[in-house]
Amino acid sequence: MQTNELITWPTLCVFGDSIVVGSDDREAGGWVARLRLDFNSRERISVYNLGVDGDRSEQLLRRLSPEAAARNASVIVIALGANDLGWQGSAGTDNALFRERYDRILSEAGRFTRRILTLGVLNVDESNESHGVSNRQVLAFNAIIEELTRARAADFLDLFGALEPEDFVDGLHPNASGHAKLAPLIARELERLGWDLS
């Protein structure tokens, strides 16, 4: 018997970066942990937090398939792009390369399920200059993510503007209040899509 044959209920796999990891939410461990608590209180579903600090599109492209296969993914959520923008002086991924990699990520995800939800990159607090990211850059990446998502008949949730300056620890990473705002927005979108997670 293979390991993934033991999983008999739906599995929601959330792929992404440190924002998905949620370590800056000292109250509940991030929006994915909050989503897990919400879903587990109502229905039988496995929610996997597959966020990795510092991940860019290049790293996610390498790990998505084996991790989705190991968990027999029923639904895949992709929340990626902040590190590709480059921050704290690091070089970002140019738009053309980001487009190519993100399209390949969607293609890989599509091998496991048609139920794919992509999340737009969060707005940043530009008054905090420590991260070096502009909302203009964020919007350019979000346009790419939305276009590629729609082209593959997947679903896109725009979260730009969902958070206020006080919802960040450093202008880029959400704090507990930021994660508390994100979790119900994402849960409602999953419910709106009508995917049977029970």
Predicted stretch roles:
Residues 1-53, 58-59, 63-72:
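Serine-esterase "nucleophile elbow" of acetyl-processing enzymes
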Residues 6, 37-43, 61-198:
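Alpha-helical cap/lid subdomain in secreted, periplasmic
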